[in-house]
Amino acid sequence: MIRAGIVGATGYTGVELLRLLLAHPGAEPAVVTSRGNAGERLDAMFPNLRGHTDLAFTEPDPGLLAECDVVFFATPHGVAHAMAGELLSRGTRVIDLSADFRIRDAALWSRWYGQPHGAPELLDQAVYGLPEINRKRIPDARLIAVPGCYPTAVSLGFIPLLEAGLVDTAHLVADAKSGVSGAGRKAQVGMLLCEASENFKAYGVAGHRHLPEILQTLGDVAGQTPGLTFVPHLLPMIRGIEASLYAVLKDMDTDLQALYEQRYAAEPFVDVMPPGSHPETRSVRGTNRCRIAVHRPQGGDTAVVLSVIDNLVKGASGQAVQNMNLMFGLPETAGLDGIAVLP
Amino acid sequence: MIRAGIVGATGYTGVELLRLLLAHPGAEPAVVTSRGNAGERLDAMFPNLRGHTDLAFTEPDPGLLAECDVVFFATPHGVAHAMAGELLSRGTRVIDLSADFRIRDAALWSRWYGQPHGAPELLDQAVYGLPEINRKRIPDARLIAVPGCYPTAVSLGFIPLLEAGLVDTAHLVADAKSGVSGAGRKAQVGMLLCEASENFKAYGVAGHRHLPEILQTLGDVAGQTPGLTFVPHLLPMIRGIEASLYAVLKDMDTDLQALYEQRYAAEPFVDVMPPGSHPETRSVRGTNRCRIAVHRPQGGDTAVVLSVIDNLVKGASGQAVQNMNLMFGLPETAGLDGIAVLP
Amino acid sequence: MIRAGIVGATGYTGVELLRLLLAHPGAEPAVVTSRGNAGERLDAMFPNLRGHTDLAFTEPDPGLLAECDVVFFATPHGVAHAMAGELLSRGTRVIDLSADFRIRDAALWSRWYGQPHGAPELLDQAVYGLPEINRKRIPDARLIAVPGCYPTAVSLGFIPLLEAGLVDTAHLVADAKSGVSGAGRKAQVGMLLCEASENFKAYGVAGHRHLPEILQTLGDVAGQTPGLTFVPHLLPMIRGIEASLYAVLKDMDTDLQALYEQRYAAEPFVDVMPPGSHPETRSVRGTNRCRIAVHRPQGGDTAVVLSVIDNLVKGASGQAVQNMNLMFGLPETAGLDGIAVLP
Amino acid sequence: MIRAGIVGATGYTGVELLRLLLAHPGAEPAVVTSRGNAGERLDAMFPNLRGHTDLAFTEPDPGLLAECDVVFFATPHGVAHAMAGELLSRGTRVIDLSADFRIRDAALWSRWYGQPHGAPELLDQAVYGLPEINRKRIPDARLIAVPGCYPTAVSLGFIPLLEAGLVDTAHLVADAKSGVSGAGRKAQVGMLLCEASENFKAYGVAGHRHLPEILQTLGDVAGQTPGLTFVPHLLPMIRGIEASLYAVLKDMDTDLQALYEQRYAAEPFVDVMPPGSHPETRSVRGTNRCRIAVHRPQGGDTAVVLSVIDNLVKGASGQAVQNMNLMFGLPETAGLDGIAVLP
């Protein structure tokens, strides 16, 4: 069994990682840290874990963590910067769910995250953990940057079009909507049920931190950085991201459905839906799947791609486990084959 | 007091119309019909009306309805086609909340609504009841076609850009999201709480009936029919539409904020928010307001317009009352000055 | 126009009070204070107020407040204790929405609220503002203690049974459920949408602060303090309280329906529903009504009373305005005749 | 592998049963019937099953079903009456999730379900499938009546008190609240999101069909039929039942916490929470657990028991699988060890 450490497991990505690892056939949580809750049992904070674990939170002790095979960071920005180097130097592999190592350009990172980059010397070895484009690099990686939730949904939706060079990349549009869990388990007025339920709005239109990450990925795929308008919105629900993507086609003859089906035929977690489909977020809730449908409305020159994920699974903890599976030679789907609870 | 008839008041636009008319200072519901519920008190079906009315539903008798000053149709498609002519010939004015008279081209209507147009001879006198572009024609109108909910939110958002000729009209995008009440008070599995809550999806991507209506309005404003990709989505909540609109700017020098503020300065129900705003659907819930914000993200060449309405008020019954006020010489805001209940 | 001051208007009872007073025909908000938000416009914090007021929050200056005819406290416990005395001495009447003056026994208050009572000398003049039992004392009151939300729903439900002496008062049960807005507009993890939606639980079973308040009221009505088991629960929604009340009948011959109808015949805000009804919280949302139904299931010896209110209206701000109307000789229903928005 | 048939798998208990069986280590769905959807793939109706099964619905053919080891009925009342006999006579075991065989008294069943009992001759062999009281009888049973959702939550909560003879059984109160999925996947106006969300109400106060079932179980346990007031309520959420139970203690000296812990110490699916707990429905969502807390508020003479289950799992399909496990000698928890997805 792979011994996994989790730093910062009191948030939503943390408890989701716990859920996945506690049911994983080849790994188990061994050290789970929280500065503020050391000594408390996990299942006292998260009653869904009662009967599944006797672990308690511990102080984030690098020595203890280094005894793990892999350490996950489910922490605010900057924490992995501060701790990853020591763990890596002791031979422990690191899977970071925060944004600390997602952007290759440290200066760009600093600009968007408003603080100096704490570990630019590690950027060279960080692998962006989107298996659908980086699968070959992940097994040998020591340091994985798990993609953000919006970047996962948006990138997977655009990749086939961009790889095939079918669209005008100057004016891509990504209209994305996320459940409230994307904002984390922090006390903030805007995420109260009274504020966020029976309500809908865009936010961060001027510029969201996931924009440079998406541009980096799409640029890698397209060969040059595209022009992208990215508008996130807050959905009155807990889990799920839907991204509706718009691109003007330069080539109207390609069978988009076939293109998508072929691109993702071998991907265990990308499900291209039948023609005419409208993927629902609930169909992937609690699972590591991304469901995608591609449309060309009214036979016009605009492609519409609909992409849904669970922001806490394929958009965070599930993708982290998928990376762990690849890093440790386990079946890629190990521990990730649950069926969405519906309704 | 204006005596108002309502045909088909058992749906959501019907009960909303009742709420507005029962509190209106210059009008009152006089005849309220329902074929299936004749004899039943309104407040037995809608307990929120207890203490506010003693009316009961009656059979839809044209003679009785013709005694009203104005008759509202809150009915499925085709009913107003069948009944409006007789009422008009008897001198009763008609405000139709269905789509029966929204499209000027009867053949186009038939194609989208899948049935022959039942009253093409009345199309000439029908006025599209969007006061923000047709205010002058409404006072003398005998027959008003109340705009659809999506068309109201989308058109009000695009109008300033199109009137000013600032954007490439070949590739407009309208990504719209609606609460479930837009689907009406019909027993259908897809709108059950178990299906529609904690879930999000697009629908009707191939072609939604509101598309030709939007194209007609935007075409009137722009001077030619634009290219528009319109994708509606279903929100896990009751009321509210948010439309996020995308257009590529041909002219980057215009102050968009000033443009929108000036265009709507005299409009009592269009509120242009301060720069950088993200209008929330709840801020207009139960009210006749449309709140709009305009952005140019990252200083790029794409304008993003965010437009919110309550689909049952400005998107249906409130706009119907606004038209009634204009038709009968009442203050345009009469009975429409309520404040949104928040939270 | 009555000039009203509001201390602490940044919470949910505050914004609800603003909504009601801004639409009130005989009163208006004149001074609205907030220590933390002085200088900010009300409609910047609460966009539903845009177009309805130009007021800004000010520092809570007793001098300014004393120029008002009446000052509402929508504050945490203890604030009204500290400020009410000075206002009263200057002739300004006080309507306190907090619990500061609800309990006549200062020692009992201290025990439940965990702090010394800050103004025991004012308790003599405080009138418990439940018009349905205290209507005669309210017009001359200088200091009103607005009842809590649960106490309003529970007391109105039990009063007819207790006044008539029909039930065993040793074992009353009140199973009450409240929307999340009852917890206020405070940043706290437990009230996040992610924690409170799609979830249900009891809380405070060991003892909730509203228990002594309910016991005081029921004791006044029954002539002696009853035995009451009161269990509150948290509903996954914003507004509304439903209380299901259980009492064993000593007398099986009384017509409970008639009893309730007669008791509340003259009450403008208590609506006894027809036999067999199940009142819905949404039917009173945004309104000052309490809807009640009384049942005797299976013809047995247990009475079941179902009572619903909007916790922010009849359970707080609406009842406060009802008291104001009575204190200043206005029609009791002035500004409180809105119809619930449904759906 | 146990070959399972499912009759009527298009409802919510049906799809939940599919989810559980598709992931079950010792059983698999072999025949899945639906009269109205024969020929359609399961995953076309339920997209969460995409990638997990290639099965399609078939006509309910008794011959095909009889080839299964066990057949589950997830059907409206009366269907199992009509078909169970033939299957049993062919040696196929039957697990009925409907109410057809829950009540031992056929006349009583007819009275509550408003139709003649269709198979009274089978009642003798039907075993009420609540393992916590009937575990010994289940392995040899040929016909299992899976308990209703409310009866499961209420009975498990009351059993320890009644078995120990600690309470006055004349005036038990069960105030129960259920998510909307309890009403099934039927098109009905009352269960639309627009009707059931942001709303709460009691229903069926005069008499709910689960009442005689609860009385039968509690009577078995207590030795005589108790007096019970049972009031169900509709929660604005999808899954979960919470039952708050009230009973007057005859004996004040018993340690209720110890009583409950001992009673359920060996039960794999009943989790007695620590003293002072308030179990949340979400902590059992998607799982077969019942979580229970017992309180004696204010040290008084009334016991309050809080019991939560997922109505579709421990209240239906999960309990059905638990019975199957016991019937076929599998580990009782096989396929039922998932962790609730939280948040």
From Swiss-Prot, chains A, B, C, D:
UniProt entry keywords in alphabetical sequence: Amino-acid biosynthesis, Arginine biosynthesis, Cytoplasm, NADP, Oxidoreductase
PROSITE patterns xref list: ARGC
UniProt subcellular location: Cytoplasm
GO cellular component: cytoplasm
Associated pathway: Amino-acid biosynthesis; L-arginine biosynthesis; N(2)-acetyl-L-ornithine from L-glutamate: step 3/4
InterPro entries (alphabetical): AGPR_AS, AGPR_type-1, NAD(P)-bd_dom_sf, NAGSA_dehydrogenase, Semialdehyde_DH_NAD-bd
E.C. numbers: 1.2.1.38
Recorded catalytic activity of this chain's protein: N-acetyl-L-glutamate 5-semialdehyde + phosphate + NADP(+) = N-acetyl-L-glutamyl 5-phosphate + NADPH + H(+)
Enzyme class, first EC level, given as a word: oxidoreductase
SUPFAM superfamilies on file: Glyceraldehyde-3-phosphate dehydrogenase-like, C-terminal domain, NAD(P)-binding Rossmann-fold domains
Location of the active site: C149
Molecular function (Gene Ontology), one example: NADP+ binding
Any one Pfam family match given in the protein's UniProt record, by short name: Semialdhyde_dhC_1
One of the protein's GO biological processes: L-arginine biosynthetic process
PANTHER family: N-ACETYL-GAMMA-GLUTAMYL-PHOSPHATE REDUCTASE, CHLOROPLASTIC-RELATED (PTHR32338:SF10), N-ACETYL-GAMMA-GLUTAMYL-PHOSPHATE REDUCTASE, CHLOROPLASTIC-RELATED-RELATED (PTHR32338)
Its biological purpose: Catalyzes the NADPH-dependent reduction of N-acetyl-5-glutamyl phosphate to yield N-acetyl-L-glutamate 5-semialdehyde.
Family: Belongs to the NAGSA dehydrogenase family. Type 1 subfamily.
Stored NCBIfam families: argC
Protein name in the entry: N-acetyl-gamma-glutamyl-phosphate reductase
Gene: argC
